[in-house]
Amino acid sequence: DCGIVCVMSGDFVQRGDFAVVGKRARAAAAVRSGADLVLELPLPWAVASAEEFAFGAVYALAASGVVDWLAFGSECGETKLLDGLAAALLDERFPALLREELRVGDSFAAARQRAAARLSPDAQLLESPNNILGVEYCKSLRRLGSSVRPLAFPRRGSQHDSLDCRTRFPSASAVRFLLREGKRAQALDLMAPVMADAFRNEEAAGRAPVFREGCERAILARLRSMSRDDFAALDLGREGVGNRLWQARGEPSLERVLERAKTKRYPLARLRRMILWAYLGVLPGEWAHPLYLRPLAANRTGRLLLARMRSAELPVLTKAAQVRKLPDSSRRLFSLETRAADLFALAYPNLAASLAGDEWRAGPVML
């Protein structure tokens, strides 16, 4: 027997969007489904590129001091292949090869795959999104010199982003699509029973489903109030994507902003994340790594793990007030996360449920 520790995005997610259901309800559902402890991936890493998303998650789990294996799903399910490709991407020759391929003018993903193919026979694995994340998890473990060992297992069911609802395990995209289309009953049938119950409870409380459209005018207002320099600050690579968003900021809907700004080199997911950074006040690269661990839900075994985490490399915040004893950088990160939670609440279907300050009142769900 072993404890199962999960790390999970909070109210905003890596695809550059609002989570349909709030983080504590999802974390509690995860514990009811077999996890023992769920930790929150702090906001700057939850809404980052695959590389930074993976690094934040791996850093948090490694810093907990209670994790020996890092298990994750991928399309190929072969740990050795994914880890070998991670080693190729960390090869000292790779950055120069990538720059050479980027000059062709293709997307970053295509250029990276071609550069990787010059060092590894398995570069085609980078065509699949969960293989990409798996490679990034392995890369992060190698970068950190961690003793945690990776363990890939094959994904089952629909492919990432598939809208096919006829499979036994449909994608989350399919469920979100049905909810957006008002097909609630069909969406609930596709959810795991525990998650369906959590959704119904949040729905009854006026807190679900949450969609970006609930805050669309506020997001557009934020974009229109930003200067060209503000947009440039979101573009770490200085590739011009910030300027494209600045030029598109006056469009009357977020879909129109995205449609005008996107190119082959700047995919929609990246643009959605940048818009979310603008709305929430996230500055990419402001923090090198997570600064604290924050549990969202736990059962009895999870509470025992939390007791062992008193000697973790990062402070564990079971109460929000504990952050006041941490350094200024940690307090600034927590302040960013509390503001983001307040903005998320404004997208609730029932505005009366969107009282600000919940992050200071709510602790982990103990089951």
Regions found by a protein language model. Name each.
Residues 28-42:
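A glycine-rich helix N-cap at a beta->alpha junction
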Residues 2, 35, 66-67:
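Short, high-confidence coil segments that cap the C-terminus of an alpha-helix
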Residues 41-367:
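Active-site cores that bind ATP or allylic diphosphates and position pyrophosphate for catalysis
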Residues 25-29, 106-108:
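Short low-complexity stretches enriched in small and charged residues
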Residues 10-12, 39, 45:
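Glycine-rich phosphate/pyrophosphate-binding loops
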Residues 20-24, 32, 48-55:
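Generic alpha-helical scaffold signal
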Residues 1-26:
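N-terminal catalytic cores of NTP/NDP-binding nucleotidyl/phosphoryl-transfer enzymes
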